[in-house]
Amino acid sequence: MKIVIADDHAVVRTGFSMILNFQDDMEVVDTAADGVEAYQKVMQHQPDVLIMDLSMPPGESGLIATSKIVESFPDTKILILTMYDDEEYLFHVLRNGAKGYILKNAPDEQLISAVRTVYRGDTYIDPKMTTSLVNEFVNNTGQDANSTNDPFRILSKRELEILPLIAKGYGNKEIAEKLFVSVKTVEAHKTHIMQKLNLKSKPELVEYALKKKLLDF
C-alpha cells in the first residue's frame, strides 16, 4: 500500500517513515509538513492511506485538510495522528471523514495495526480513547444538546480556518495572504462568524476559541 505522512515535525515524518517502510506491504511514497502540502501530495500520489497530524501550522490544520481531502479523494483513507486524548477531537475528525485516530505515543506495532485497519476500510480508534467513545454513546440520548453551540456544525470550512487566526491576533491582510483570498473576503467571513456565534467583541471570540479548543487547529 502507498502511504503519505503529514506532520510539521521532520523527526516524526522520518521516524514513522522508517517504521512503515520496514513492513513488506507498506511504502511511504512522500511526506508533507502542513495541510496544504498534504492535499498536494495526495493529489500527486493518490495514496491508499494518509497519516496526518491534527495540529499543524495555522491556516490549514489537519482537521480542515481532512475534510477537503475526503471530499476530493474519497479513496484515500485518513489516519489522524495526534497527542490529544480528548473525545472532542476524536468526534470532530470522525465527523469530517477520517477513518482512524491514534495517539503519537502509541507503540510501533499499534501504528502498523492502525494503518492496516484503515486500509481495509475499517475504523481504528486508539484503545486509550475507546472508553471515552463508549461513554459518549451511552450518555447520548439521541439529541445533541450542544449542537447549537458546536462550531464544527455552525461554521463553514472557510470560517473554521479564519476563526483561529483571528483569535491568535492575525490581521485581516495577514489572514488574506495565508489563505489566498481578498481582505474583503476575510472581513465578510469575520462578520459572519461573529453573527453565527452571537459574539459581540474580539475578546469574546478569543474566549470562545479557547473554550472550544480551536487554537490548537
UniProtKB/Swiss-Prot annotation:
Species, as recorded: Staphylococcus carnosus (strain TM300)
Domain HTH luxR-type: 148-213
Gene: nreC
Modification type 4-aspartylphosphate: residues: 53
Record feature DNA-binding region, as residue ranges: 172-191
UniProt GO BP: phosphorelay signal transduction system; regulation of DNA-templated transcription
Subcellular locations according to the entry: Cytoplasm
GO molecular function (one): DNA binding
GO CC terms in record: cytoplasm
Domain of life the protein comes from: Bacteria
PTM annotation, UniProt: Phosphorylated by NreB.
CDD domains xref list: LuxR_C_like, REC_NarL-like
Keywords of this entry: Activator, Cytoplasm, DNA-binding, Phosphoprotein, Transcription, Transcription regulation, Two-component regulatory system
The keyword Iron is annotated on this UniProt entry: no
Function description: Member of the two-component regulatory system NreB/NreC involved in the control of dissimilatory nitrate/nitrite reduction in response to oxygen. Phosphorylated NreC binds to a GC-rich palindromic sequence at the promoters of the nitrate (narGHJI) and nitrite (nir) reductase operons, as well as the putative nitrate transporter gene narT, and activates their expression.
Protein name: Oxygen regulatory protein NreC
Domain Response regulatory: residue ranges: 2-119
Predominant subcellular localization, coarse grouping: cytoplasm
